Curated annotation (Swiss-Prot):
<dbReference type="GO" id="GO:0003924">
    <property type="term" value="F:GTPase activity"/>
</dbReference>
<feature type="binding site">
    <location>
        <position position="173"/>
    </location>
    <ligand>
        <name>Mg(2+)</name>
    </ligand>
</feature>
<dbReference type="InterPro" id="IPR006073">
    <property type="entry name" value="GTP-bd"/>
</dbReference>
<dbReference type="GO" id="GO:0005737">
    <property type="term" value="C:cytoplasm"/>
</dbReference>
<feature type="region of interest" description="Disordered">
    <location>
        <begin position="128"/>
        <end position="147"/>
    </location>
</feature>
<feature type="compositionally biased region" description="Basic and acidic residues">
    <location>
        <begin position="349"/>
        <end position="364"/>
    </location>
</feature>
<dbReference type="Pfam" id="PF01018">
    <property type="entry name" value="GTP1_OBG"/>
</dbReference>
<feature type="binding site">
    <location>
        <begin position="315"/>
        <end position="317"/>
    </location>
    <ligand>
        <name>GTP</name>
    </ligand>
</feature>
<keyword id="KW-0547">Nucleotide-binding</keyword>
<feature type="binding site">
    <location>
        <begin position="284"/>
        <end position="287"/>
    </location>
    <ligand>
        <name>GTP</name>
    </ligand>
</feature>
<feature type="domain" description="Obg">
    <location>
        <begin position="1"/>
        <end position="159"/>
    </location>
</feature>
<keyword id="KW-0378">Hydrolase</keyword>
<feature type="region of interest" description="Disordered">
    <location>
        <begin position="340"/>
        <end position="364"/>
    </location>
</feature>
<comment type="function">
    <text>An essential GTPase which binds GTP, GDP and possibly (p)ppGpp with moderate affinity, with high nucleotide exchange rates and a fairly low GTP hydrolysis rate. Plays a role in control of the cell cycle, stress response, ribosome biogenesis and in those bacteria that undergo differentiation, in morphogenesis control.</text>
</comment>
<dbReference type="InterPro" id="IPR045086">
    <property type="entry name" value="OBG_GTPase"/>
</dbReference>
<dbReference type="InterPro" id="IPR014100">
    <property type="entry name" value="GTP-bd_Obg/CgtA"/>
</dbReference>
<protein>
    <recommendedName>
        <fullName>GTPase Obg</fullName>
        <ecNumber>3.6.5.-</ecNumber>
    </recommendedName>
</protein>
């Protein structure tokens, strides 16, 4: 299925039903009084995050979503039925924006998370509400209120722990195939990957992490060149980026260092926060470098690239070095989660009563 990561839709909640201005008319009841019921509430439009859905393609074609109107009230104290709500199921990771103001309405990050996108209109009042000691036969009633309608922009940002970053044909798809259950298209030409691929990497019975492979970047991606700029947003939720570099390009005129610097430059131009994310260097295709030249090739790259962070040497094709990379990632993610758990368990110092005790003698 084609990956669709953005869509625009219109949601229209149902109008409330009108109240009734009916009078009770029965044999032997000459002054029956008002018996007009209220109108029913209009149906609302809801969104719910569903982990079994991984695309917004349904909303690319179905752009208008309407809930039912509430029914009108009737005589004999009959209230109108409420309009049925409708629920729009969206992938986990969908950000919902107001298309007119670009205000972020919600971020669906948890499976089952539920949100009202458009509230149904309230039903109108029947004339039974207007009866008083001075007005025994009221003819007043109110109409139902209109339901909300909104133009929305849906944007899907995949939820992954690790993001793969690199030039086209750097071997990212081969790497995600080697370490995970993902099976993207692989070929020996650039731009094989046309949409993000997610893979689950299992490192133990109860341990795993998710890797995202996005289309390769080229210079000028931040301004819209190539395909990768459309998907850079998917890296914003990751915890660590793997910068995959082809250390043995077929075209000998291509300088891997210059390409790596171009990628870093695109990151910086696109989003400073993304640029500051933890980033590891993964030097790929070492199987294409003669064994006696590998050490010198790696040292030369690291020196010219002026890289100070973690470096992993791998061959995604032969799986050489991939297991060490996987275990290093899992260890890093475990440490991050342990730190987050410790921070969440720490008491809030603002609520510690001992911090608010004041020694009045010292103040004197």
């Amino acid at each position: 299925m084609k990956f669709i990561d953005e869509a625009r839709i219109e949601v229209i909640a149902g109008d409330g039903g009108n109240g009734s201005a009916s009078m009770r008319r029965e044999k032997f009841v000459p002054f029956g009084g008002p018996d007009g019921g209220d109108g029913g509430r209009g149906g609302s439009v809801w969104a719910v995050a569903d982990r079994n859905i991984n695309t917004l393609i349904d909303y690319r074609f179905a752009k208008k979503h309407l809930a039912r109107n509430g029914e009108n009230g009737r005589g004999a104290d009959c209230y109108g039925a409420a309009g049925d709500d409708i629920t729009l199921r969206m992938p986990v990771g969908t950000a919902i924006y107001d298309a007119d103001t670009e205000e972020l309405i919600a971020d669906l990050t948890i499976d089952g998370q539920r949100l009202c996108l458009a509230q149904g209109g309230e039903g109108g009042w029947g004339n039974i509400h207007f009866k008083s000691s001075t007005n025994r036969a009221p003819r007043q009633k109110t109409d139902g209120k209109a339901g909300e309608r909104r133009n929305l922009r849906l944007e899907l940002k995949v939820l992954a722990d690790v993001g793969l970053l690199g030039m086209p044909n750097a071997g990212k798809s081969t790497l995600i195939t080697a370490i995970s259950n993902a099976r993207p298209k692989i070929a020996d030409y650039p731009f094989t990957t046309l949409h993000p691929n997610l893979g689950v990497v299992r490192t133990g019975p109860s341990k795993s992490f998710v890797v995202a492979d996005i289309p390769g970047l080229i210079e000028g991606a931040a301004e819209g060149a190539g395909l990768g700029h459309q998907f850079l947003r998917h890296l914003q939720r990751t915890r660590v980026l793997l910068h995959v570099v082809d250390l043995a390009p077929f075209d000998e005129s291509v300088d891997p260092v210059a390409e790596a610097k171009a990628i870093v430059g695109e990151l910086k131009k696109y989003d400073a926060e993304l640029f500051d994310k933890p980033r590891w260097l993964v030097l790929n295709k070492l199987d294409m470098v003669p064994e006696d030249e590998r050490e010198a090739r790696v040292k030369d790259f690291v020196k010219r690239f002026k890289w100070k962070g973690p470096v992993h040497r791998i061959s995604a094709l032969t799986h050489d070095g991939t297991q060490a990379l996987v275990h290093a990632i899992q260890e890093y993610l475990d440490e991050l989660r342990a730190e987050e758990d410790a921070a969440a368990a720490a008491p809030d110092q603002r609520l510690d009563p001992t911090l608010h005790n004041v020694d009045h003698d010292d103040q004197a």
